[in-house]
A protein has these predicted regions:
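Hydrophobic structural segments
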Residues: 1-279
């Protein structure tokens, strides 16, 4: 296994395209083609973490927070960030940060906290816009089910709690191939009219490459007619934060105590209490 194999798996779970614009996520240090000897997972990449990685023969660190947040202009070892980067490079240790890419996916950090707190009716607090696209294509009637099912299989047509969503309009497609064409139906230089279906499906933007690859692989025509449109709707599967309801209402101080227990921590910071129940 190489570093890129691990990255591919991580980015299937948490695509970097959904990270906040200010963030610095992805592979920060190291070679994507290096063989992985071990993976160390951490909240922050510190000097002690580098030492632990060396001790345990881990040459890939997967960190939640990025050690490099702003551009480095020098590598002199003047501060801890520079020292960590220098030591990682010297010892061929790759560093990968996931941060808000994992914050913003439906099954990410916030969902894990909600599950630990046993929250019900949970949903994204601040849904992102600009994360959805629409594919419109035109398929011969006889091939519609095959093409549509393959697009469903790779993730097209998912809308929150619903899968396999599409819109289908019957119509007629026309074309006339020139002398360099190789039409699947009809012949060169002949005008042809065929019963087709306009197929429309929504998909999340990180899936565009696999969606188009699947369309081209399953559509019978030599030249596939299609359009990709950006959709500005809120995506309630992508966004920052998550909100839900506790199994039962409880006083604020009791909630804080339960929170400490559930999160297995002895210390938390909180805002001023108002002697109200939390649900």
């Amino acid at each position: 296994m190489i570093v890129q194999n691990v990255i591919t798996h991580l980015e299937e779970l948490s695509p970097l395209t959904y990270a906040e614009e200010y963030d610095n996520v992805g592979l920060l240090v190291g070679n994507r083609k290096a063989q992985v000897t071990g993976v160390l997972v951490t909240l922050d990449t510190t000097e002690d973490v580098i030492e632990e990685a060396l001790k345990n023969k881990c040459n890939l660190i997967v960190s939640f927070h990025p050690i490099i947040f702003k551009g480095l202009k020098k590598l002199t070892g003047h501060n801890y960030v520079e020292r960590i980067v220098i030591k990682a490079i010297k010892n061929d240790i790759a560093i990968y940060a996931i941060h808000t890419a994992l914050d913003n996916v439906i099954n990410g950090v916030n969902d894990a906290i909600c599950r630990r707190m046993e929250l019900r009716n949970k949903h994204i607090l601040i849904p992102q816009k600009g994360t959805l696209k629409k594919l419109i294509t035109y398929v011969p009637k006889s091939n519609l089910v095959k093409v549509r099912n393959e697009l469903f299989r790779v993730g097209a047509g998912r809308l929150e709690h619903y899968n396999k969503c599409s819109f289908n309009i019957d119509g007629k497609g026309t074309f006339e191939g020139n002398e360099t064409s190789n039409p699947t139906i009809g012949s060169q230089g002949a005008f042809y009219e065929n019963a087709e279906v306009q197929l429309s499906l929504i998909f999340e933007k990180h899936l565009e490459k696999i969606i188009l690859h699947t369309l081209f692989a399953t559509h019978p025509y030599e030249k596939v007619a299609y359009e990709i449109l950006s959709v500005d709707n809120h995506n309630h599967n992508i966004g920052m934060g998550m909100i839900g309801e506790l199994p039962e209402a409880m006083e604020e101080l009791r909630f804080l105590k339960v929170l400490k227990q559930k999160m297995n921590t002895s210390f938390i910071k909180h805002s001023k209490t108002f002697n109200r129940k939390i649900k």
